[in-house]
Design a protein with these regions (language model features):
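A short, structured beta-strand/loop element
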Residues: 27-64
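Negatively charged, low-complexity tracts enriched in Asp/Glu with abundant Ser/Thr
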Residues: 1-27
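General helical secondary-structure elements
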Residues: 2-5, 30-32, 47, 71
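Low-complexity, intrinsically disordered short peptide segments enriched in small/polar/basic residues
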Residues: 12-14, 44, 71, 75
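Intrinsic disorder/low-complexity segments
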Residues: 20-22, 37, 73
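Compositionally biased, intrinsically disordered low-complexity segments
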Residues: 15-20, 35, 81, 85
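Mixed-charge, Lys/Arg-enriched low-complexity segments
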Residues: 56-85
Length: 85
């Protein structure tokens, strides 16, 4: 998925730069995405991990999301802990 605008909240524009999904269960999925939030003051990139589900018409709905700063140390820590737990 290349640069897709998903939505605006107030004066913040969110753009999905890249996203990958994995399905699990009957109609659930996890999405890991790199996103950019842009305001009048500038922009910020971050990683988003979201859980969602598919509606009967196959459209997607997101339930929960966790944002992770785009910091190599934090990303490394999270990846290491996920593998070791």
């Amino acid at each position: 998925m290349d640069e897709e605008t998903r939505g605006k909240r107030g004066d913040v524009e969110f753009v999905t730069i890249r996203a990958e999904k994995i399905n699990f269960g009957r109609n659930n999925f996890l999405e890991v995405a790199r996103k950019r939030a842009t305001t009048a003051e500038g922009s910020n990139e971050f990683i988003s991990v979201s859980r969602g589900y598919y509606l009967p018409d196959k459209s997607e709905r997101f339930k929960r999301s966790l944002t992770i700063p785009d910091d190599p140390g934090i990303k490394s820590f999270i990846a290491e802990k996920i593998k070791s737990l």
